[in-house]
Amino acid sequence: MRMLLCLNVLTLSCVWAIAMEIPMSTVVKETLIQLSTHRALLTSNETMRLPVPTHKNHQLCIGEIFQGLDILKNQTVRGGTVEILFQNLSLIKKYIDGQKEKCGEERRKTRHFLDYLQEFLGVMSTEWAMEV
């Protein structure tokens, strides 16, 4: 019953966020604030071990980040304002999954591929932490 209630609340919040067209940047900012607010509660179980990617390029470790999040969510007392934190993180995951679907390939001319590759390498050179 509790799981059903949680799923209903999560579904309602997703629908609400979509209906209200809240920008994902706003959801991310609110989630960062909530994370800071609830950090003490989330770190109260010092015996829990979560997977932490050793790679510094977070874009490459999304799966591992959300795997750790699922473990944390399952080990944390639910309810109250911490529930909103997990709902927002779920919204962010759904957004990222939706964006990953846009990675589907489309056959184009070599010039288009090279333009995309150049843009990708530009992002790598400016936004990714490069290891020596």
Curated annotation (Swiss-Prot):
* GO CC annotation, single: extracellular space
Annotated glycosylation sites: N45, N74, N88
User: Keyword Ligase: yes or no?
Assistant: no
Q: Which Gene3D superfamilies match?
A: 1.20.1250.10
What superkingdom heads the lineage?
Eukaryota
* MF annotations from Gene Ontology: cytokine activity; growth factor activity; interleukin-5 receptor binding
Record's keyword annotation contains Transcription? no
Q: Where located?
A: Secreted
Predominant location category: secreted
GO biological process entries? cytokine-mediated signaling pathway; immune response; interleukin-5-mediated signaling pathway; positive regulation of B cell proliferation; positive regulation of cell population proliferation; positive regulation of DNA-templated transcription; positive regulation of eosinophil differentiation; positive regulation of immunoglobulin production
Q: Where is the signal peptide?
A: 1-19
Alphabetically sorted, this entry's keywords are: Cytokine, Disulfide bond, Glycoprotein, Growth factor, Secreted, Signal
Query: What is the documented function of this protein?
Result: Homodimeric cytokine expressed predominantly by T-lymphocytes and NK cells that plays an important role in the survival, differentiation, and chemotaxis of eosinophils. Acts also on activated and resting B-cells to induce immunoglobulin production, growth, and differentiation. Mechanistically, exerts its biological effects through a receptor composed of IL5RA subunit and the cytokine receptor common subunit beta/CSF2RB.
What does the record note on quaternary structure? Answer: Homodimer; disulfide-linked. Interacts with IL5RA. Interacts with CSF2RB.
Q: Which family does it belong to?
A: Belongs to the IL-5 family.
Identification of the protein by name: Interleukin-5
**Organism of provenance:** Rattus norvegicus
Give the organism's phylogenetic lineage. Answer: Eukaryota, Metazoa, Chordata, Craniata, Vertebrata
